[in-house]
Amino acid sequence: MSDSGHSQPNVFIPGRNRRRRWMDQGPAGNLNLSEPGREKDSVLRDRDQERWEGNDEGCGYTIQKTPIILAKPASDRAKAATPAAPAPIEKPIVLMKAREEGKPTAPAEGAAVPPAAAVAKVEKEGQRPTQPVYQIQNRGMGAAASAGGSVDPVVGQAKLLPPQKMKHSIKLVDEYMNWCDSAIEFLLDQTDVLVVGVLGLQGTGKSTLMSLLSANSPDDDQRSYVFRMQSQEVRERAGNQTSGIDFFISQERIIFLDTQPILSPAILDHLINNDRKLPPEYNLPHTYVEMQSLQIAAFLFTVCHVVIVVQDWFTDFNLYRFLQTAEMLKPSTPSPSHESSGSSGSDEGIEYYPHIVFVQNKSKREDFCPRTLKQMHTVMDKLMLHSHLRYKGTLSMLDCNIFPGLPYDFVESEVNLFLIPTMESDADETISRAGTSGIPLFSLLPAYKGHPSFHSLVSRLRSQIMSMSRPQLSHTILTEKNWFHYAARIWDGVKKSSALSEYSRLLG
């Protein structure tokens, strides 16, 4: 009842209703008046009484209210549904090591863990190559990957394989003095390269020496040499084996250039007897042969770090005159590009000249006498006195302990001269040990030769040539492939040289 005496229909008092229910359960006669029943009723009454008192103490009357649900606006819900993009993180530089096959690699502490998408991509592509893929892209495959296609690990692994090993020499310049492009397949884009060329008269052993310096051993079969030697038939008819310029690159990335003999009578005889047509700028065959030799020598003086001059006796003065003529007709070092020419004006007068090594092949025992050796150095120094070629100071036989007991200053002006004896077989050594009766006197002792063995001398010559300095051939650092294109340009310039054309007209 309200203060006005009227009842309020929407007021609900749960405590009172529950009280009335248990109070109006029925007449007292229907109740169980036994002791257990009374105890149960008293417990129920006490419990309900406590509930009632609790409701009365809280707020008196309880009014049921409509629940209110709080929700965010639609714009805020869209922002909450879209996660914020993470800030761009710089890619760490990771030094990777080629892992062993069948051995999982554990990530190091502090290393960036790759995302799940990247891991799934690697698993989808297959087994990971031993080298990182980013190194493959740096070798020229990045453009293909950025164009939309992923890098194939198999193709990348093939790119990282070592270069193909050459088994024999190939032509760089053919017998008609035309340039050949087949050597570019064996070259790499690296700058640590040494170029060694050879010059010499016919039959002095140029191809044999270059084979022993490049890839072969004196014990190998001579038919397997990388540069073909003179066969018995060619030797009997006094012919030449090499024509043009042959090319070979070793596993140590050393380029060897074997050339046809200079001033060769066999080539002159071939021109005369076979009625080969001479180029229009040459009138006589011997002029053409000499100009061919000068072109090859001038080419080697421009593109080689080391030029070996082989002779089998001491000495031919015409050979030194030829070297001085080739030095005079050598093309000049190409000038730098116009972009850098203004800043390097002081370097315009610098001209490149290679190292010259004189090899005395088929030397006799008397040539290894210290007194004879000193006289040879003195004569060669006077013959090359006015030359700009680096003919001294880069190779020494005294440093190899070939002449034990001789001081280093025994030769006042030591030229780059190296003596090599005749290559002997095991049968020749056995015969040299035998006495007059044909029975070896000292079979356990080596025969006295007056010089070290052929194997030892070739090995020492090879080590000294490989350790020579490698100055820049041009004003820029050249890789192997850049050297090939540079050499092709030099060869074309040599063939069209006005100085060589003028000299050929002077020869008649």
Curated annotation (Swiss-Prot):
Biased composition (Polar residues): 1-10
Residues passing through the membrane, by range: none
SUPFAM superfamilies: P-loop containing nucleoside triphosphate hydrolases
General function of this protein: Involved in nonsense-mediated decay (NMD) of mRNAs containing premature stop codons. Is recruited by release factors to stalled ribosomes together with smg1 and smg8 (forming the SMG1C protein kinase complex) and, in the SMG1C complex, is required for the efficient association between smg1 and smg8.
Stretches with biased composition (Basic and acidic residues): 36-54
Protein's name in the database: Nonsense-mediated mRNA decay factor SMG9
Keyword Protein biosynthesis: no
Annotated region (Disordered), positions in chain: 1-59
Annotated keywords: Nonsense-mediated mRNA decay
Quaternary state and interactors: Component of the SMG1C complex composed of smg1, smg8 and smg9.
Similarity remark: Belongs to the SMG9 family.
GO biological-process terms attached to the record: nuclear-transcribed mRNA catabolic process, nonsense-mediated decay
